């Protein structure tokens, strides 16, 4: 799928010249191009048009979570039919371990992870690993820290399609290898449940779950369901 802006506005003023100048510089291999403009001059909209013209995946970096969140919402509105993802640190609170010599006090490491942001991070990683080109990732400096080897992500991918010849037992083994946990009651992200010939998988990077229906050793149907 190609990038396609959804907006009632068109570039105006100095924006068309800026869009063309940036696109031309990037096509010619420039390492850096600077877009100048006062607050409210439409720099985000200008860059959205650059992305649409170049048709390349984009990484949008912000110096803090607040601005990253704002940019994510704006790019999401400009590209509602493309993969606009959000990737920032998932810590609500982080206390590193410490030692106070004067009082001989050891402070253990303590942290709190935001489940919603963790889900968005997984969604971003999934979009990048999917091979699609229409991906925009809005991130803070958190993206500088590695989250693992891409080959490990690929090796833990479970691919299914209607008509696939695979036993239900074999699929369950694949899900466990991909670090999903079986449950019958607490159906949440990263878990799966089995009900007869039906396997429901709650995705790690989405609010939806996948229902896989079997007929013998063949996948008969696939559908998205509400985990709740």
PLM-predicted stretches and their roles:
Residues 1-228:
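ASCE RecA-like P-loop NTPase motor cores
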